[in-house]
Amino acid sequence: ANESLDADFLMTPNVQSLPDVKVEAKAPVRAKLREFEERRIAGAGGRFLTQADFDKRAWSSTADVLRSSLPGLEIKRDAGRPSQAYAVGGRMQVPGGTLAMAPPTGAPPPCFAAVVLDGAFVYQGHSGEPLFDINSLNPSVIAGIEYYSSAGSIPARYNGTRGTCGLMIIWTR
């Protein structure tokens, strides 16, 4: 019962063609923009501009893009330096479209929106603090902007104990 058997087998490939598959997916969100995208998708109380909004108006100043895209956000230009622009928050007290300010001594009594750039405050709204010129950023470097007009809508991470005139969060590419 100890017999062995030798056998040769000829194997030929039997290839089956499958139909083409098309895979579509959104590009992964960069870690830097994750919280922006989470709040934007959730509709978390703010108004949002994406990179596509800025790409469509790359020839404009950042202030002009904001002025035309975020109704209710007041943009003020410095009368002495008209290329500079600042976001005025909900309790705006400045008439007209320009400010008369002493050279960079800081914010006068009107209520300017606080500004966060890539997660760090660059203007917090303290008296005498230098304002942040939103035109210092070209639209081509902006990945997204969030604007919150009232303290109740500001994300907890950025809502300190100070009174607020709104918050603008700017994300760069």
Regions found by a protein language model. Give the residues of each.
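Soluble periplasmic/extracytoplasmic beta-strand elements of cell-envelope proteins
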Residues: D6-L10, D20-E24, F48-L49, V65, ...
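Short, glycine-/polar-rich solvent-exposed loops and beta-turns at beta-strand/coil boundaries
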Residues: A1-E3, I75-A87, N138, Y158-T164
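Residues that line or immediately flank small-molecule/substrate-binding pockets and catalytic motifs
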Residues: A25, S61, R77, E129, ...
